[in-house]
């Protein structure tokens, strides 16, 4: 398998991350040293993608407590809880963020020690375990998804659910990397993904680095590409999946799903188990982040719309489960009926 660069890592006692806001123009490594700097990196999309956000948040907890002066476990847990609440306020939609924070807190709560130094090491150990497990999950998603795309010549993807959004390999792009390693190279059409252009800036960059042929299109060209028969599948990632199979992903995903249905093209969602939120019965319960209006009204620093108009800028939309052909996870491929099969597969039962 192609070995893509890791977007977030722990090296020589510090966090290293690619500043994704600067791609593709510059490849810049940043090193957040405080929880505030990590919060800023998450909020400003220097690190993005649900799995990568979870990893960053877990490492952010370590940055928050590594110099803790707590005298006992109770004091340490209080500091950890405060840091977790702070990091949770950075972005509200990606469930992996909250999952990772909760996992680290639970590991500390279960620790049979009152030694603060040992608890600090436990926080770091758990954060790095989340990172390593995510990479393994992405590999597994690649294996499961490859069988679904084996007969395709080209696929369309939206936003970036590749190596830059995870520990490595990605979710939606993992099957593409897996097939390439086997000698089958798919062509990829990448939506530019307005307003922040993650498809143009990130997906095309990493696929081009991998030697995989990629064609950039504007978001409003997807229907034409499908109508001409140029793609045989659509594959996207997810930021949150509810118990019934509704999928929150980057704004514009819902429209792509509708187009795929109209053109008889399978619409696949690739995501790890940590992206599922079984506490929510449907997509209408997912909080949707709304971002700075300037992201829509400006192109960089240049205004592209008149001042004083209304601007709507949700970061995500929700694709109803009925448009989803299958959900690819590290545990296997989930097909309808989703409410029943999601519960079974996540519990480790056969489909």
From Swiss-Prot:
Residues given in the record as substrate binding sites: 48-50, 91, 198, 249-250
Keywords: Carbohydrate metabolism, Isomerase
Leader sequence segment: none
Site (described: Transition state stabilizer): 159
InterPro entries: Deoxyribose1P_isomerase_DrdI, IF-2B-related, IF-M1Pi, IF_2B-like_C, Initiation_fac_2B_a/b/d, M1Pi_N, NagB/RpiA_transferase-like
Active site per database record: 239 (proton donor)
EC number: 5.3.1.-
Taxonomic superkingdom: Bacteria
GO biological process assignments: L-methionine salvage from methylthioadenosine; pentose catabolic process
A Pfam family that the UniProt record links to this protein: IF-2B
Keyword check for Aminoacyl-tRNA synthetase: no
Catalysed transformations (reactions): 5-deoxy-alpha-D-ribose 1-phosphate = 5-deoxy-D-ribulose 1-phosphate
GO molecular function: S-methyl-5-thioribose-1-phosphate isomerase activity
Pathway named in the protein's UniProt entry: Carbohydrate degradation
Family recorded in the similarity comment: Belongs to the EIF-2B alpha/beta/delta subunits family. DrdI subfamily.
HAMAP family: Deoxyribose1P_isomerase (MF_02229), Salvage_MtnA (MF_01678)
Function: Catalyzes the isomerization of 5-deoxy-alpha-D-ribose 1-phosphate to 5-deoxy-D-ribulose 1-phosphate, as part of a 5-deoxyribose salvage pathway that recycles this toxic radical SAM enzyme by-product to mainstream metabolites.
Descriptive protein name: 5-deoxyribose 1-phosphate isomerase
């Amino acid at each position: 398998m192609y070995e893509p660069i890791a977007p977030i890592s722990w090296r020589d006692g510090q966090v290293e991350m690619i500043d994704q806001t600067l791609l593709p123009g510059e490849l810049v490594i940043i090193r957040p040293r405080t929880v505030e700097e990590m919060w800023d990196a998450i909020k400003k999309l220097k690190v993005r993608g649900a799995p990568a956000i979870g990893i960053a948040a877990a490492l952010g907890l370590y940055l928050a407590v590594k110099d803790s002066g707590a005298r006992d476990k109770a004091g340490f847990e209080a500091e950890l809880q405060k840091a977790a609440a702070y990091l949770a306020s950075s972005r509200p939609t990606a469930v992996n963020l909250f999952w990772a924070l909760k996992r680290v807190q639970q590991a500390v709560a279960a620790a049979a020690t009152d030694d603060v130094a040992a608890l600090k090491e436990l926080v770091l150990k758990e954060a790095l375990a989340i990172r390593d497990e995510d990479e393994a999950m992405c590999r597994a998603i690649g294996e499961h998804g490859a069988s679904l795309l084996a007969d395709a010549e080209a696929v369309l993807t939206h936003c970036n659910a590749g190596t830059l959004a995870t520990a490595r390999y990605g979710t939606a792009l993992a099957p593409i990397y897996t097939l390439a390693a086997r000698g089958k190279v798919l062509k990829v059409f990448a939506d530019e993904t307005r307003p922040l252009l993650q498809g143009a800036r990130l997906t095309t960059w990493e696929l081009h680095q991998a030697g995989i042929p990629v064609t950039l299109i504007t978001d409003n060209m997807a229907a034409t590409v499908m109508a001409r028969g140029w793609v045989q599948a659509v594959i996207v990632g997810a930021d949150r999946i509810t118990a019934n199979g509704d999928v929150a992903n980057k704004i514009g995903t819902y429209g792509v799903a509708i187009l795929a249905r109209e053109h008889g093209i399978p619409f696949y969602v690739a995501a790890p188990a940590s992206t599922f939120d079984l506490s929510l019965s449907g997509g209408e319960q997912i909080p949707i982040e709304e971002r700075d209006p300037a992201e829509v009204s400006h192109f960089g620093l240049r205004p592209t719309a008149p001042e004083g108009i209304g601007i709507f800028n949700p970061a995500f939309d929700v694709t109803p489960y009925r448009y989803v052909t299958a959900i690819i996870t590290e545990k296997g491929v989930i097909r309808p009926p989703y409410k029943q099969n999601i519960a079974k597969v996540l519990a480790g039962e056969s489909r």
